[in-house]
Amino acid sequence: MQPSTLQALTKRVLATQHVSNDDYCILKRFGLWWHDAPITLYTDGEQILIKTPCYKEGIKLNTALVLAVKENNYDLIVLFTEWGANINYALLSVNKEHTRNLCRKLGAKEGLEASEVLRFFFETKRHKTSSNIILCHELFSNNPFLQNVNMVELRMIIYWELKDLTTNLIVNEDSFTEMLTKYWYGIAVKYNLKEAIQYFCQEYEHLNEWRLICALSFNNVFDLHEICNTMNIDMNINKMMRLACMRDNNFLTIYYCFALGADINRAMYGSVSNFRIENMFFCMDLGADVFEESLELAERHGYSVIVDILSLKIYKANPILLSKETDPEKINTLLKNYYPKNMLAYDICNVDNYL
């Protein structure tokens, strides 16, 4: 959407330019100033993002509008609307009658449909940066508009985003606010958004175990290392390994738990039980040798593929993995694009049999 006035267009063009510190007075005069710093506008594909030192990674134009409304910043409400922000979304954070009247003058409706609230929620959360995730948490926590949406639909959105979690701690018994807090915290860990992780860690100490579970589930060995070295962990290492093994291809966090002393045979047995074939092969690479027990378990579950795999007597540990390294950078380098040696041996055996 193009700005509606020449002045708004001029401001938009100016906001895309590099301006030296000496000319900041021009930006202030044009109203391109927010949180004691200049506003920068840039495009990322089809979306418009607003940058300030507080939001150096950028936030969407509609999100910036909602924040400006929350702060009752009338000049920026008008400016962002002229730049194309949807003034109806202002209703999500309006907290003063004077601001509500301004939004009406700019064309805002009297209320938002539940579908519109969900659309804004869905669009806003797509921008995976620390500043945006923290802002989403602040905007949506205790927001009365979210109480009116279809809770089943909202929970489905959250479950889908966190579908790789190995345990479901976002349960129906959680309060609505607690559910959302866990959601944003989980997103921060999933995408290793360090500033957001630190924010939630400081604000919600009672969710330390949730952070640990997310790190294990999302294969975030960097955060797992920090948790194990800076926090008191009230979880057995074998339970940590079990959580890591429940999602296939979680080689980084499986290896880290192995390096800390987790029982690799128990990990292989659990991988077989949950039909995590890649993890099973990786456990073999790490020295697991409970082949007969795992074969019997696979037969009981009717896992014919695993029965076929374990019927072969060709598997052995990969020596390069047995050093038990705990440096996350070295682990990441070691296992980046790693293909289990024993899986390769099985593949070769299958090809030979086929030929």
From Swiss-Prot:
Organism: African swine fever virus (isolate Pig/Kenya/KEN-50/1950) (ASFV)
Alphabetically ordered keywords of this record: ANK repeat
Function: Plays a role in virus cell tropism, and may be required for efficient virus replication in macrophages.
Biological process terms in GO annotation: taxis
Keyword Magnesium in annotation: no
Protein name: Protein MGF 360-3L
Entry-linked InterPro entries: ASFV_MGF360 (IPR002595)
Keyword Zinc: no
Recorded family membership: Belongs to the asfivirus MGF 360 family.
ANK repeat residues: 60-92
Superkingdom: Viruses
Family matches, as Pfam families: ASFV_360
